[in-house]
Amino acid sequence: MKQSIITSFLVFAFAAILMAQAPTAKIKTEPVSSETLTKLGLTTNSVSAGLPVFANQTYVYLSANDVGGYLPVLTSSFNLFQKPGGSAATLEDIGVANWTGLKADVKGAYKVELTMTTANGTDQDTITLYAGDYVGVGNFDGVSAAFPSCMSCHTGQPAFDNIYSSWQNTGHANTLKKAMDTWSFFSTSCLKCHSTGTDYDLVAANNGFDDVAAALGWVWVGPPAPGKWDAFKTAYPTAVKFATIGCENCHGAGSNHTSFQQTGSEFKTMATFEAGVCNQCHAESQGVQYESSL
């Protein structure tokens, strides 16, 4: 009986503290996979890693959250109060409660403010988002890195060299190379997961593999056969830095990395171990092993 009274008291005390806690607004960048697009009924056709660094002409998804009182959000209002010169981008109602979507149309920084209300009051938060073009990993399979590719600067830095050395032996680095030479079937539809920056469903010009390859005149002619990767590499060396699942697939499009750093901005490339980054590709039906690991 005594234990029950103490337990009840603690529950009521905790509830009282929770109800008295002022809200703390937080804008979260939401990861969205192809499966999530279908589940939520989104018509944007744009997957997202859930990072504030994202590719130009694609979407970033934002949600309103209370990380102070952890109470349900009653109302939320997002305001895009700063964007790059020449941008006509607007925040979009995507049909999900307390979410908004932003499709970048110009490279640069976008600043969004949230005003959020819970039963305990109102609070605000801001976030800076960076839309950029892809630059490619560089220094892959004997093709030297040229600025502004990632390894044109990071080669020779022990921490990065160690990461790169491990990465270049993985499937993420070598899948497209192997696909051209040895797969029983390969088509350009495979590129959206097995290269850097190829349009997933939403058409976007952001210097991804598909954009670079098209500009160079590369056209895949199947079927796969030994030597096709080497022929591609020899004829189109500037496309090789995009022909992997490289740095930017997980860190976000990197063209702003050097320009914003040089101006003293708070911008840095982003990294997260959250599943949303992997889900850009692995949430599809062929990712059964990955799904089972969650």
Map each language-model feature to its residues.
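Bacterial N-terminal signal peptides
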Residues: S8-I17
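Intrinsically disordered, low-complexity segments enriched in polar/charged small residues
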Residues: T7-S8, Q262
